[in-house]
């Protein structure tokens, strides 16, 4: 049975609570009848309201009228907004209330599908992987694709790439396609290679690599654009599959206190979001990104924008997203100097500087917001250079261009974020997941400027945090913990934290997950802080993480999620 946090629990206490309220009102100079127009639909009192306004003000109570906040302040002050029998009054019993989390970077459709497909996240042995694949194959007709994601060779294969032979032993009747945890490498079996006509004579595609053995034969590992040679053969999810995945993802977002997402999914999700919005079932605000390659074909953009029905503050089109490089885990992130553990490689760039400069300048002139995936220091430098050239050519405007991930930076490039107004859109748990092997890939010197949250803030950069789900868990609280401690959930390293000088405070991290993320999508005037007239999206936490040791963040849950002024999630009873 669910915890009746917002219904029976408070109905049972209502008489006692109202005795208290009436006593307070007796000493108040303002009666209920004097301000009828201000009466609230929902009041939360006796709590700790973390507003995240410009002064980081705290309150004890908050009132909501419709889908907007109409009061933040004291328990006494909120009495003017209560109408007995009509206003829902909730005693928070000291629990903190924060703005709803805004996930600035995730893949909502992929996340939902990952919960419905083979999920290899966290598998530490080949036996675990085989067990999950066999369970899926048992219910999959011969000849049909087996698709999954989440494997990480640094967990189960001594850091070495797995190969097709292992998958061939599990099935020779199903083509298998499994993406790595970062989504930038595919592991396939021989049948999948055969279906794609990939053999020793197949050249590497531009921006990709077919990993080969000593004889030149494909091993079953396909990096970056090479993965598309197989991925393009896999039947697309049906409308029903996508709808189920999005509904599953929305349920996950609710329980994690996420009320806004900045989504990098297939644009086929737009009709699904529209339908859910019409039904009143879209309980997360969506900014849907567009492919940067569309900049080359403006007619595609015009066609989509003319057909797309924006739904106010609920559903809108977001920036144009592109990729400059890959990831550290797969050694495809683009670096100035070779990888410490592979002197033959600097990663795989997706653009030459001149092409990137031209495209970004063109997009900026058209007034489009741009965000580019860049992880390696060379990739980040390339994007910053292109943004600077666009500014010099087109003049300064409120573009709010972004770099997604911004994981490895040169010291001289960090000030450019603030100088150019470029948003660093980062995911804190990447730091604590990657630290297991980051020094092996980069060496200690480059790690000093990796995941450099503190340095970026010092140089007046705007931070926007997200989860990158399903690459990392859809849990912003884990991100808060990572940003504050730079430790993994097990508490490692114990002392000191991993390059601890780049850690930030809890309030700074929370701002990046809320008002900072809202700024990154031009909606900081609507949401991201708990202020009068802003949208009533908020989260009640089970513990006061602002006074407890940081490790308690991981033991904290979302007690309730309020979206658009409505309670949409209540934590189940234990």
Report the location of each language-model feature:
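Short beta-strand segments in beta-sandwich/barrel cores
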Residues: 48-50, 67-69, 519, 538-539, ...
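Flexible, active-site-proximal loop/turn residues at the rims of small-molecule/cofactor binding pockets
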Residues: 152, 267, 430, 545, ...
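Bacterial Sec-dependent N-terminal signal peptides
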Residues: 1-37
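Divalent metal-binding segments
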Residues: 37-45, 50, 54-303, 318, ...
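His/Asp/Glu-enriched, well-ordered alpha-helical/loop segment
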Residues: 244, 361-371, 375-401, 405-406, ...
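Glycine- and charge-enriched low-complexity intrinsically disordered segments
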Residues: 570-574
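Non-cysteine beta-strand/loop elements that form the S-adenosyl-L-methionine
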Residues: 314-332, 421-432
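Structural alpha-helical segments in enzyme catalytic/regulatory domains
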Residues: 308-310, 418-421
